[in-house]
Structures are given as C-alpha cells and as structure tokens.
C-alpha cells in the first residue's frame, strides 16, 4: 500500500 508501504508494497 502507498500509506503503509513499509510493511507491504502494493
């Protein structure tokens, strides 16, 4: 995700 991009990129 753009907002929580540290844990999961997508």
Curated annotation (Swiss-Prot):
Its EC number is 1.6.3.-. The keyword Oxidoreductase applies. Keywords: Antiviral protein, NADP, Oxidoreductase. It comes from the Eukaryota. One of its GO terms (molecular function) is oxidoreductase activity. NADPH oxidoreductase. Has antiviral activity against BmNPV. This is NADPH oxidoreductase.
């Amino acid at each position: 995700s753009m907002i929580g991009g540290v844990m999961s990129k997508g």
